[in-house]
Protein backbone atom coordinates (compact mmCIF):
# COMPACT_ATOMS: atom_id res chain seq x y z
CA UNK A 1 0.00 0.00 0.00
CA UNK A 2 2.62 2.54 1.04
CA UNK A 3 4.77 1.86 -2.02
CA UNK A 4 1.79 2.80 -4.17
CA UNK A 5 1.19 5.93 -2.07
CA UNK A 6 4.79 7.07 -2.50
CA UNK A 7 4.58 6.36 -6.22
CA UNK A 8 1.37 8.43 -6.42
CA UNK A 9 3.05 11.34 -4.64
CA UNK A 10 6.31 11.49 -6.56
CA UNK A 11 5.16 10.29 -9.99
CA UNK A 12 3.08 13.48 -10.29
CA UNK A 13 6.16 15.68 -10.38
CA UNK A 14 5.69 18.65 -8.05
CA UNK A 15 1.90 18.56 -8.02
CA UNK A 16 1.62 17.92 -4.27
CA UNK A 17 3.34 20.25 -1.81
CA UNK A 18 1.19 19.20 1.16
CA UNK A 19 0.90 15.50 2.03
CA UNK A 20 -1.36 14.28 4.84
CA UNK A 21 -1.11 10.77 6.31
CA UNK A 22 -4.07 10.14 8.59
CA UNK A 23 -6.53 7.34 9.34
CA UNK A 24 -6.06 4.33 11.61
CA UNK A 25 -3.25 3.84 14.12
CA UNK A 26 -0.21 1.55 13.74
CA UNK A 27 -0.24 1.43 9.94
CA UNK A 28 3.16 3.03 9.24
CA UNK A 29 2.24 6.66 8.61
CA UNK A 30 5.26 8.20 10.36
CA UNK A 31 7.71 5.70 8.88
CA UNK A 32 6.38 6.42 5.39
CA UNK A 33 6.69 10.18 5.92
CA UNK A 34 10.29 9.62 7.06
CA UNK A 35 11.07 7.58 3.94
CA UNK A 36 9.56 10.31 1.76
CA UNK A 37 11.60 12.97 3.58
CA UNK A 38 14.80 10.94 3.10
CA UNK A 39 14.00 10.83 -0.62
CA UNK A 40 13.40 14.60 -0.64
CA UNK A 41 16.81 15.10 1.00
CA UNK A 42 18.38 12.77 -1.58
CA UNK A 43 16.88 14.79 -4.46
CA UNK A 44 18.10 18.05 -2.95
CA UNK A 45 21.62 16.69 -2.44
CA UNK A 46 21.72 15.42 -6.04
CA UNK A 47 21.51 19.01 -7.35
CA UNK A 48 24.93 20.29 -8.42
CA UNK A 49 24.25 23.70 -6.85
CA UNK A 50 20.90 23.83 -4.95
CA UNK A 51 21.29 27.51 -4.04
CA UNK A 52 21.88 28.50 -7.66
CA UNK A 53 19.05 26.26 -8.91
CA UNK A 54 16.53 28.02 -6.65
CA UNK A 55 18.04 31.47 -7.16
CA UNK A 56 19.30 31.94 -3.59
CA UNK A 57 22.52 33.34 -2.17
CA UNK A 58 25.52 31.02 -2.02
CA UNK A 59 25.57 31.30 1.78
CA UNK A 60 21.90 30.32 2.10
CA UNK A 61 21.16 27.15 4.04
CA UNK A 62 18.19 24.92 3.30
CA UNK A 63 16.41 23.12 6.14
CA UNK A 64 14.80 19.73 6.70
CA UNK A 65 12.61 20.15 9.80
CA UNK A 66 10.74 17.85 12.18
CA UNK A 67 7.92 19.34 14.25
CA UNK A 68 5.70 18.03 17.04
CA UNK A 69 3.56 19.58 19.80
CA UNK A 70 6.61 19.75 22.09
CA UNK A 71 10.30 19.98 21.25
CA UNK A 72 11.09 16.80 23.21
CA UNK A 73 8.55 14.82 21.16
CA UNK A 74 9.89 16.38 17.96
CA UNK A 75 13.40 15.20 18.83
CA UNK A 76 12.38 11.79 20.09
CA UNK A 77 10.03 10.46 17.41
CA UNK A 78 10.40 11.21 13.70
CA UNK A 79 13.73 13.06 14.00
CA UNK A 80 15.34 10.09 15.76
CA UNK A 81 13.96 7.51 13.32
CA UNK A 82 14.98 9.68 10.35
CA UNK A 83 18.62 9.77 11.47
CA UNK A 84 18.55 6.04 12.26
CA UNK A 85 17.29 5.43 8.72
CA UNK A 86 20.07 7.49 7.14
CA UNK A 87 22.64 5.73 9.33
CA UNK A 88 22.10 2.42 7.53
CA UNK A 89 22.14 3.95 4.04
CA UNK A 90 25.44 3.54 2.15
CA UNK A 91 24.60 6.51 -0.10
CA UNK A 92 23.98 8.95 2.75
CA UNK A 93 27.07 7.70 4.59
CA UNK A 94 29.11 8.37 1.46
CA UNK A 95 27.75 11.91 1.04
CA UNK A 96 27.72 13.18 4.61
CA UNK A 97 28.79 12.50 8.18
CA UNK A 98 27.07 11.92 11.51
CA UNK A 99 27.67 13.87 14.71
CA UNK A 100 29.93 12.12 17.23
CA UNK A 101 27.27 11.49 19.87
CA UNK A 102 26.45 7.77 20.18
CA UNK A 103 22.87 8.29 21.34
CA UNK A 104 21.77 11.64 19.91
CA UNK A 105 23.65 11.57 16.62
CA UNK A 106 22.27 13.45 13.63
CA UNK A 107 23.14 13.62 9.95
CA UNK A 108 25.24 16.43 8.46
CA UNK A 109 25.04 16.50 4.63
CA UNK A 110 28.27 17.27 2.79
CA UNK A 111 28.82 20.91 1.84
CA UNK A 112 27.34 22.32 5.05
CA UNK A 113 24.49 24.01 3.17
CA UNK A 114 21.67 21.74 4.35
CA UNK A 115 20.51 21.71 7.99
CA UNK A 116 18.44 18.98 9.67
CA UNK A 117 16.67 20.25 12.79
CA UNK A 118 13.53 19.94 14.94
CA UNK A 119 11.10 22.25 16.76
CA UNK A 120 7.60 22.80 18.13
CA UNK A 121 6.62 26.44 17.52
CA UNK A 122 6.52 28.82 14.58
CA UNK A 123 9.50 30.72 16.00
CA UNK A 124 11.68 27.63 15.46
CA UNK A 125 11.16 28.04 11.70
CA UNK A 126 11.88 31.77 11.56
CA UNK A 127 14.75 32.72 9.31
CA UNK A 128 14.97 29.21 7.86
CA UNK A 129 14.46 28.24 4.23
CA UNK A 130 12.44 25.07 4.77
CA UNK A 131 12.63 22.58 1.90
CA UNK A 132 10.84 19.70 3.61
CA UNK A 133 9.12 19.23 6.97
CA UNK A 134 7.33 16.50 8.92
CA UNK A 135 4.64 17.62 11.36
CA UNK A 136 3.73 14.72 13.62
CA UNK A 137 0.57 15.60 15.54
CA UNK A 138 0.87 13.66 18.79
CA UNK A 139 -1.67 13.19 21.55
CA UNK A 140 -1.97 16.50 23.43
CA UNK A 141 -2.69 14.98 26.84
CA UNK A 142 0.27 12.60 26.55
CA UNK A 143 2.45 15.61 25.78
CA UNK A 144 1.33 17.25 29.05
CA UNK A 145 -0.67 19.97 27.31
CA UNK A 146 -3.79 21.01 29.22
CA UNK A 147 -5.12 23.78 26.97
CA UNK A 148 -5.91 21.67 23.89
CA UNK A 149 -7.55 24.53 21.99
CA UNK A 150 -4.49 26.72 22.43
CA UNK A 151 -2.27 23.84 21.32
CA UNK A 152 -4.34 23.43 18.15
CA UNK A 153 -4.08 27.15 17.41
CA UNK A 154 -0.32 26.92 17.89
CA UNK A 155 -0.17 23.91 15.57
CA UNK A 156 -2.15 25.75 12.90
CA UNK A 157 0.21 28.73 13.22
CA UNK A 158 3.21 26.43 12.80
CA UNK A 159 1.63 24.66 9.85
CA UNK A 160 0.80 27.89 8.03
CA UNK A 161 4.24 29.37 8.75
CA UNK A 162 6.13 26.38 7.40
CA UNK A 163 3.81 25.91 4.44
CA UNK A 164 4.30 29.56 3.47
CA UNK A 165 8.09 29.22 3.72
CA UNK A 166 8.16 26.11 1.55
CA UNK A 167 5.92 27.63 -1.11
CA UNK A 168 7.63 31.01 -1.02
CA UNK A 169 11.21 29.77 -1.11
CA UNK A 170 11.07 26.76 -3.40
CA UNK A 171 8.63 27.83 -6.08
CA UNK A 172 10.09 27.79 -9.58
CA UNK A 173 8.29 28.06 -12.92
CA UNK A 174 4.95 27.78 -11.14
CA UNK A 175 5.88 24.57 -9.30
CA UNK A 176 6.68 24.07 -5.61
CA UNK A 177 9.66 21.73 -5.18
CA UNK A 178 9.42 21.40 -1.39
CA UNK A 179 6.92 19.34 0.59
CA UNK A 180 5.19 19.45 3.97
CA UNK A 181 4.18 16.09 5.46
CA UNK A 182 1.49 16.11 8.17
CA UNK A 183 1.04 12.87 10.13
CA UNK A 184 -1.94 12.35 12.42
CA UNK A 185 -4.11 9.46 13.61
CA UNK A 186 -7.81 10.17 14.02
CA UNK A 187 -8.84 11.31 17.48
CA UNK A 188 -11.95 13.48 17.34
CA UNK A 189 -13.91 15.33 14.70
CA UNK A 190 -12.47 18.72 15.73
CA UNK A 191 -8.80 17.75 15.43
CA UNK A 192 -6.49 20.19 13.72
CA UNK A 193 -5.75 17.97 10.71
CA UNK A 194 -9.37 16.86 10.32
CA UNK A 195 -10.62 20.44 10.25
CA UNK A 196 -7.83 21.68 7.98
CA UNK A 197 -8.43 19.00 5.34
CA UNK A 198 -12.16 19.69 5.35
CA UNK A 199 -11.67 23.44 4.92
CA UNK A 200 -9.24 22.91 2.04
CA UNK A 201 -11.59 20.53 0.24
CA UNK A 202 -14.68 22.67 0.83
CA UNK A 203 -12.94 25.74 -0.58
CA UNK A 204 -11.77 23.86 -3.68
CA UNK A 205 -8.12 24.49 -2.76
CA UNK A 206 -7.15 20.86 -2.26
CA UNK A 207 -5.55 20.14 -5.65
CA UNK A 208 -2.07 20.61 -4.19
CA UNK A 209 -2.81 18.27 -1.28
CA UNK A 210 -2.44 14.48 -1.17
CA UNK A 211 -4.40 12.72 1.57
CA UNK A 212 -3.99 9.09 2.63
CA UNK A 213 -6.86 8.08 4.93
CA UNK A 214 -7.37 4.32 5.26
CA UNK A 215 -8.38 1.71 7.89
CA UNK A 216 -5.94 -0.91 9.12
CA UNK A 217 -7.34 -3.74 7.00
CA UNK A 218 -6.75 -1.81 3.77
CA UNK A 219 -3.14 -0.92 4.60
CA UNK A 220 -1.64 -3.93 6.35
CA UNK A 221 -0.85 -7.09 4.32
CA UNK A 222 -3.96 -9.21 3.53
CA UNK A 223 -2.49 -12.23 5.31
CA UNK A 224 -2.57 -10.24 8.57
CA UNK A 225 -6.33 -10.76 8.92
CA UNK A 226 -8.97 -13.37 8.26
CA UNK A 227 -10.73 -13.21 4.89
CA UNK A 228 -14.10 -13.42 6.67
CA UNK A 229 -15.73 -10.04 7.40
CA UNK A 230 -18.65 -8.56 9.35
CA UNK A 231 -20.75 -5.41 9.03
CA UNK A 232 -20.34 -2.19 11.00
CA UNK A 233 -22.88 0.64 10.69
CA UNK A 234 -21.17 4.03 11.11
CA UNK A 235 -23.42 6.81 12.35
CA UNK A 236 -22.95 10.55 12.68
CA UNK A 237 -23.72 13.36 15.12
CA UNK A 238 -27.37 12.30 15.27
CA UNK A 239 -27.13 8.52 14.91
CA UNK A 240 -24.86 6.28 16.95
CA UNK A 241 -23.04 3.54 15.06
CA UNK A 242 -23.14 -0.13 15.99
CA UNK A 243 -22.02 -3.63 15.03
CA UNK A 244 -24.70 -5.20 12.84
CA UNK A 245 -25.86 -8.48 14.47
CA UNK A 246 -25.12 -11.62 12.51
CA UNK A 247 -28.82 -12.46 12.12
CA UNK A 248 -29.39 -9.03 10.51
CA UNK A 249 -26.44 -9.12 8.10
CA UNK A 250 -28.49 -9.78 4.98
CA UNK A 251 -28.72 -7.62 1.87
CA UNK A 252 -32.11 -5.96 2.45
CA UNK A 253 -31.25 -4.90 6.01
CA UNK A 254 -27.86 -3.48 4.98
CA UNK A 255 -29.58 -1.56 2.17
CA UNK A 256 -32.10 -0.19 4.67
CA UNK A 257 -29.27 1.05 6.91
CA UNK A 258 -27.69 2.80 3.92
CA UNK A 259 -31.04 4.44 3.15
CA UNK A 260 -31.19 5.68 6.76
CA UNK A 261 -27.88 7.50 6.29
CA UNK A 262 -25.47 5.01 7.85
CA UNK A 263 -22.14 4.19 6.25
CA UNK A 264 -21.27 0.50 6.13
CA UNK A 265 -17.81 -0.93 6.84
CA UNK A 266 -16.71 -4.54 6.38
CA UNK A 267 -13.75 -5.13 8.74
CA UNK A 268 -12.18 -8.58 9.08
CA UNK A 269 -13.90 -10.83 11.60
CA UNK A 270 -10.76 -10.70 13.79
CA UNK A 271 -11.73 -7.17 14.81
CA UNK A 272 -15.27 -7.98 15.92
CA UNK A 273 -14.34 -8.36 19.64
CA UNK A 274 -12.69 -4.90 19.65
CA UNK A 275 -15.74 -3.25 18.07
CA UNK A 276 -18.10 -4.94 20.52
CA UNK A 277 -15.93 -4.13 23.56
CA UNK A 278 -15.52 -0.41 22.76
CA UNK A 279 -17.12 0.70 19.52
CA UNK A 280 -15.86 4.30 19.49
CA UNK A 281 -12.23 3.42 20.23
CA UNK A 282 -12.22 0.62 17.64
CA UNK A 283 -13.77 2.92 15.06
CA UNK A 284 -11.06 5.50 15.74
CA UNK A 285 -8.00 3.25 16.05
CA UNK A 286 -8.83 0.42 13.63
CA UNK A 287 -11.04 2.09 11.03
CA UNK A 288 -9.53 5.57 11.28
CA UNK A 289 -12.92 7.28 11.64
CA UNK A 290 -13.68 9.98 14.20
CA UNK A 291 -17.29 10.41 15.26
CA UNK A 292 -18.52 13.86 16.41
CA UNK A 293 -18.64 13.98 20.18
CA UNK A 294 -17.92 10.27 20.51
CA UNK A 295 -14.70 10.77 22.47
CA UNK A 296 -15.84 13.65 24.66
CA UNK A 297 -16.46 13.27 28.39
CA UNK A 298 -20.17 13.73 27.59
CA UNK A 299 -21.13 11.82 24.44
CA UNK A 300 -23.39 13.26 21.76
CA UNK A 301 -25.82 10.39 22.37
CA UNK A 302 -26.40 11.37 26.00
CA UNK A 303 -26.91 15.01 25.01
CA UNK A 304 -29.35 14.20 22.21
CA UNK A 305 -31.65 12.23 24.53
CA UNK A 306 -32.00 15.32 26.76
CA UNK A 307 -33.06 17.69 23.96
CA UNK A 308 -36.75 18.62 24.06
CA UNK A 309 -38.93 21.59 23.14
CA UNK A 310 -40.89 21.28 26.39
CA UNK A 311 -38.19 22.46 28.77
CA UNK A 312 -37.32 26.15 29.06
CA UNK A 313 -34.01 27.81 29.82
CA UNK A 314 -33.78 28.09 33.64
CA UNK A 315 -31.60 31.20 33.28
CA UNK A 316 -33.38 34.39 32.24
CA UNK A 317 -30.09 35.93 31.08
CA UNK A 318 -27.55 34.17 28.87
CA UNK A 319 -24.72 36.15 30.51
CA UNK A 320 -24.49 36.32 34.30
CA UNK A 321 -22.73 39.38 35.69
CA UNK A 322 -21.20 38.50 39.06
CA UNK A 323 -18.37 40.59 40.47
CA UNK A 324 -15.38 39.24 42.38
CA UNK A 325 -16.62 40.86 45.60
CA UNK A 326 -20.36 40.18 45.10
CA UNK A 327 -22.22 37.88 47.45
CA UNK A 328 -24.34 36.57 44.59
CA UNK A 329 -24.08 32.95 43.47
CA UNK A 330 -25.03 31.24 40.22
CA UNK A 331 -27.84 29.40 42.01
CA UNK A 332 -29.63 32.69 42.64
CA UNK A 333 -30.03 33.21 38.88
CA UNK A 334 -31.41 29.69 38.39
CA UNK A 335 -35.23 29.54 38.15
CA UNK A 336 -36.11 25.94 38.93
CA UNK A 337 -39.81 26.47 38.15
CA UNK A 338 -38.81 26.66 34.48
CA UNK A 339 -37.87 22.99 34.43
CA UNK A 340 -40.39 21.58 36.91
Where in the sequence are the language-model features?
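Phosphate/NTP-binding elements of NTP-utilizing enzymes
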Residues: 1-340
Amino acid sequence: YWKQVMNDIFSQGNRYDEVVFTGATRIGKTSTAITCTAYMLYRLMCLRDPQKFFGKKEVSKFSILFFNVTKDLAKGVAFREFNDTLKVSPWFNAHGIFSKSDRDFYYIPEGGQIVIDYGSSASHALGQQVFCCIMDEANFSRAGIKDVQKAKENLLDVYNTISARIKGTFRKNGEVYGKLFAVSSKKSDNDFIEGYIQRQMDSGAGDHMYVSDRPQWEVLPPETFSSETFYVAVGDRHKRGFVVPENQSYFDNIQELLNQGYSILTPPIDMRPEFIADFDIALRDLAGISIPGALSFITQESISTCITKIRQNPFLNDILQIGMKDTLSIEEFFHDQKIL
